[in-house]
UniProtKB/Swiss-Prot annotation:
It holds the Pfam family DEAD. This is ATP-dependent RNA helicase DDX55. Residues 502-548 are annotated as: Disordered. Residues 502-512 have a biased composition (Basic and acidic residues). Its main location: nucleus. The Q motif is unique to and characteristic of the DEAD box family of RNA helicases and controls ATP binding and hydrolysis. The C-terminal region is required for DDX55 nuclear import and association with pre-ribosomal complexes. GO terms for cellular component: nucleolus. It is an enzyme of class 3 (hydrolase). A motif (DEAD box) lies at residues 171-174. It comes from Xenopus laevis. Interacts with 28S rRNA. Interacts with double-stranded RNA substrates in vitro; the interaction stimulates ATPase activity.
Amino acid sequence: MENVTEGTWDSLPQKLNGSIRRTLEELKFTHMTPVQSATIPLFMNNKDIAAEAITGSGKTLAFVIPLLEILLKREEKLKKNQVGALIITPTRELAVQIDEVLSCFTKHFPQFSQILLIGGSNPVDDVRKFKEHGGNIIVATPGRLEDMFRRQADGLDLVICVKTLDVLILDEADRLLDMGFEASINTILGFLPKQRRTGLFSATQTQELENLVRAGLRNPVRIAVKEKGVAATSTQKTPIRLQNYYMICKADEKFNKLIAFLQKRKQEKHLVFFSTCACVEYYGKALEMLLKPVKVMCIHGKMKHKRNRIFTEFRKINSGILVCTDVMARGIDIHEVNWVVQYDPPSSASAFVHRCGRTARIGHHGSALVFLLPMEESYVSFLSINQKCPLQEMTELIISVDLLPKLKAMAETDRAVFEKGMKAFVSYVQAYAKHECNLIFRVKDLDFSSLARGFGLLRMPRMPELKGKNFSDFVSTLIDTDSIAYKDKNREKQRQKMLKERKEKLETEGRKHFAKNKAWSKQKARKEKKQKVALKRKKEEGSDIDEGDVDELLQDTRLLKRLKKGKITEEEFEKQLTAVGGKSEVEEGSEDSN
């Protein structure tokens, strides 16, 4: 099913509940989007749905509304701890967002309790909340939900609670699989009753997703919704109200271009994407220092407890910058995002589309810009062909001030900045080497000197990818980087303590090494003693060798070793060897005379 259009809520075959209609009016949703128009009637008619629609097309309401309608029509009212609907989504941020949208509706239905189960909170608290307040509708991330199913020892048996399940929603299903949740999803599906309605929503279709459809859905209706106004032969995957731009610049120009771009738009709200968590940490700090008083916030996948707070705070502010990784690339709906800036292209072409889709949400206008190196220019054509995502070049940006010296000065005066810069550079190169489109993004073609200057590095880091490379056009700082201190006095105090302990350890290990040498000498003496015993045994067994022969043999061996090590010359060796032999002969003569 593809040819669907927008329509009013009253045009639905089944009339919506009055409270749901009032909520839609409160939220100022007067018309359905194409995906809502296609999905809601089928879902309300008890069909399983596999829906593919572009990012920002209104998929959340496409499952929230029929989910509530199905629960309202239940013959038997749900008890507090009975689960009627389950929504699984890949990230905490998306789960929080869905939970908020759902709350706008459930506040009119006190008979339904809802609960949010995501990482970053104490699972024991989640169990307590569920037992106290119930959870007729659960919004969850896969990891936490799987953990809750296994927590029977805490007095909650979620397996029993989901026996009443009517609706299962897998939101951003392709991302669920991309993020490695396939095993968790299969485990969760094993706990759920077969008699249920299932809705699977995604922005792209893959073979892995097809396998999930076969495993989790029964005779699903497949829906692929295109943008209204897009030609039938086209399958453009970004909203038509989104303007996509690209800019070609050298690696050591990118940072200055980014600053110039953001300074011109200080009163607006932007997302700036980087390829790694370390790059977010480093450039986020740099932007915060150089763009004051603009509000700059950072979020990435390695943040545990702060992510939810930062995400909520950014959604509330009217202007500012959120520096992030692809943790923010899917499904997140932040109002009034003016620009999505991709400082680094993402690791896959599909992720490019999802990043852009954080602006121009549900009918709003928005713009996106990606910075590309000269060697990456063919990526523009690749996106146009592979993702049906046309881009136009932005050329008018003028750099007024070179801020790279300031970036280096920050590293020279604070070890935290210096270390973050080195770590960011290494992580960027490693991520670049793993790029999905490696015919365009070739790590061997990178200008590492220009890249290092763009990162404001004081010296080149040691890493395998740089082995054998020439960096004649990169000038390292004259400062001894080991002497750079942390601005944070406590961290610097701790560092000095560690340096002192390391020095003492090295000195101790040196003394131990000396002791080992002495022990080796003893070992050598024991070895010689063994040789004597062995030779003596041979003599007792009838050998012609006597103790004098043994001593002479050992002395000859020692002399030979000294010669090999260069401790004596050949002349000295011959002389001492003769002396040893002469001595033996004298001793033998005296013994014969006796």
